[in-house]
Amino acid sequence: MNVFNANDKVLIVNGGGFGQRFVDLCELHNIPHDEIKLDFGQDITKEILDEYSNQGFTGFLVNICETSSGVYYNLDLISEFCDKNNMLLVVDAISSFLANPLNMTKDNIDVFITGSQKALACPPGISIIVLGDKALERVRNNECKSMYLDLKDMLNNGERGQTPFTPAVTILLQINARLKEIKNNGGVEEEILRISELANDFRLRIQDLPLEIRCKSLGNSVTGVYCINSEADTIVDALKKEYGIWVNPNGGEVGKKMFRVGHIGNLTIEDNDKLIEALHDLKQRGILKWLK
C-alpha cells in the first residue's frame, strides 16, 4: 500500500504460508496481482519465470527464504528477470538477513524487509524496511491510506530526527547492542559463516537418522526435516517435554510429517550436539523410526 496501488500489476512467488501472505495483502489492498504457485519446498527456475515475461508486471514480491519449508529461492534468477522486465523487486528477507549473503545493489533489490526477531536475535516488535531510489520515489508519489504504516509520513518525520509515533525503544536499543556485538565478532560475513557452519553441521549429522531433507535449495537459517515413519508432532513434543529442546513445528498438510530446526541467534555447535544426541535417543527408544 506504500509502494504499489490499483494501477500496478505485481507477481508473487507463493510456495508456502508466507508467500500466501503477500497474496492476501494484495487482495486486501486491491492491488492487481498474479502468483507463481510452487509446490512446497520447490525452487524457482528460469523456465518458470520465462512464462511471465513481457506481461506488463510492475512489481515482484518474494519471501526469499520461505520459512515454512526452508527453501531459499534463486535470487540471481529473480533479479535478472526483474531487471529484464523493468519490475520493482520487493524482498522479504526476514529469515535470510544475516544468514545468507544479500546485497541490495548487486541483487537489484528495491525494497528490503527484515525484522528484529530472526538472526538479529532480538525480541519481535520492530520491522526494518530499506528502500532503494526507485522505491523511495514510489513512496513519495503514492497515496497511502494508513495511519500507522505510512512510509511517507515516517520518512518526513525522519528528516527531523523523529518517528511519527513512539517506537519500541527498548528493542531499538537491543538491536543497537546486537549490531555492535556482530561487528566486534568479525562483522556480517563472519556471522553468516557461523550460521552456515551450524546449518551444515546439523544437516550432515542427521544422515544416519530416519529423517529426510527434501528441499534441494536451502538457506542457512532453517532446515525442514521430514520424519520417514514417525509423526513429526510427536517428535517435537518429546524433544520439548523430555529433553528441554524446542524445535519448530509445522502446520497444515505437513504438520505430522515435518518439523523445522533453526540455526540462527545464540545457537552453538554444542546445541547441535544436544539435539542430535536426543534424536538418537528417540531412535533407540523406537519413537523415531525407519519402519512402521
Map each language-model feature to its residues:
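Conserved active-site segment immediately N-terminal to the catalytic lysine
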Residues: 105-117
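Conserved PLP-binding catalytic core of the aspartate aminotransferase-like
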Residues: 211-242
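PLP-dependent enzyme catalytic core of the Aspartate aminotransferase-like
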Residues: 257-292
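Conserved PLP-anchoring active-site segment centered on the Schiff-base-forming lysine
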Residues: 4-18
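Conserved PLP cofactor-binding pocket of PLP-dependent enzymes
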Residues: 242-260
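Active-site phosphate-binding strand-loop segment of PLP-dependent enzymes
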Residues: 43-98, 111
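Active-site C-terminal subdomain of aminotransferase-like
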Residues: 117-201
